Regions:
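Active-site-proximal flexible loops/turns
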Residues: 38, 77-78, 225, 237, ...
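Membrane-interface elements of multi-pass transporters and channels
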Residues: 44-48, 72-80, 98, 110, ...
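Membrane-embedded catalytic scaffold of the fatty acid hydroxylase/desaturase
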Residues: 57-176, 241-326
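Membrane-proximal, cysteine-centered motifs at transmembrane boundaries in secretory-pathway
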Residues: 17-18, 280
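Alpha-helical bilayer-embedded segments of polytopic membrane proteins, i.e.
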Residues: 19-65, 92-97, 150-162, 177-225
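Membrane-proximal N-terminal segments immediately preceding the first transmembrane helix
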Residues: 2-15
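Transmembrane alpha-helix/helix-exit interface in multi-pass inner-membrane proteins
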Residues: 158, 222-239
């Protein structure tokens, strides 16, 4: 019996992979409540400064809704793929304007090949460099950005939401998505409602201010949540011989658990547990951590967990270390 088979047996015996309909019903209603609050504030407040605060709040709400799309893509919510896909299409395409099909393909490629050059799309993000060879291959403006990427990282992720929207549109134009027509209609509906409401309720320049703040916060929040997961962790050689268990554990970083952290990070602070068992419901990750952390210690498998602040220090330190190859 392989180590992962042994671990999966323990996780199954504890019922941690069982679906959690009550929990996800609560999360869906909570997020819809957040969204409704933001929309009501948009309709009743006639003050650009207060609407700027609302734009920040809505950036937070969009990311929280995005976590639901992430969970549905991993089949955490329902047993059947179709039901999960329907949730993903609604929260992804309709509510936040990001293609569920694009995200599903992109994210599954990452899960199957974490921190592997040419295979993991998360380490092929222009204009950053995640390993030495990648840094040395940069030219022109991207080389300049990589040279100072430790300083540019957080300003760059302000555009993370915009980047995902552009990728979504390109995906639907160029690829035969399973739900291509449905996705296209829902995406068009999102932008029609989003832009229509803002420009009709706020007017020209105020709507543009709201959009700029809203999308920047959406990108910053989302990028900050995803950053600690793997950035600065070991990059694997293309011919590595690691089994599934070791590959997923040593390339991931956990952030120390706390109810507030769990909420803010949408459960992604349990990145090791999530990568080992992607379909494990979000509210069972903390319980799974107790099992998996103990299992890794027993079998001398490196298990990296740190604080929120230290995780960002490690990430920026890694970016500075990679950029040193250009400074040299």
């Amino acid at each position: 019996m392989s180590q992962f088979t042994e671990l999966r047996k323990i996780i199954n015996q504890k019922g941690l992979l069982n679906k959690q309909p009550a929990y996800y019903t609560y999360k869906i209603l909570l997020n819809l409540g957040f969204l409704a609050t933001g929309l009501i504030l948009l309709m009743v407040i006639d003050n650009i400064w207060l609407q700027s605060v609302n734009a920040v709040f809505m950036g937070f709400v969009f990311t929280q809704i995005g976590f639901m799309g992430h969970d549905s893509g991993h089949r955490q919510i329902f047993h059947g793929a179709r039901k999960n896909d329907m949730i993903g299409l609604i929260v992804g395409n309709l509510l936040i304007g990001i293609s569920y099909g694009w995200w599903y393909d992109y994210h599954n490629a990452h899960h199957g090949n974490p921190n592997q050059p040419d295979l993991d799309p998360d380490i092929k993000i222009a204009p950053l460099a995640f390993y030495e060879e990648q840094a040395r291959g940069k030219r022109g403006l991207t080389r300049f950005i990589v040279k100072y990427q430790g300083y540019f990282y957080f300003p760059l992720i302000l555009f993370e939401g915009l980047s995902k929207r552009v990728s979504s549109i390109r995906y639907l134009l160029m690829k035969q998505s399973r739900y291509r027509m449905v996705e296209s209609v829902l995406l068009l509906a999102h932008y029609s409602i989003y832009l229509g409401l803002l420009f009709s309720l706020l007017g020209g320049w105020q709507a543009l201010v709201f959009i700029a703040i809203n999308q920047a916060i959406f990108g910053l929040y989302m990028g900050s949540v995803f950053a600690p997961n793997h950035k600065g962790m070991p990059i694997l050689e293309s011919d590595h011989k690691l089994d599934y268990l070791h590959m997923q554990v040593i390339t991931a970083r956990n952030i120390t658990a706390h109810p507030i952290t769990d909420f803010i990070y949408g459960g992604l602070n349990y990145q090791i547990e999530h990568h080992l068992f992607p379909s494990l419901p979000r509210n069972k990750l903390r319980e799974a951590q107790e099992v998996i952390k103990s299992f890794c210690q027993k079998h001398s498998i490196s298990y990296h967990e740190t604080s929120v602040l230290q995780s960002y220090r490690e990430i920026l330190g890694h970016f500075h270390e990679i950029s040193a190859f250009i400074h040299d």
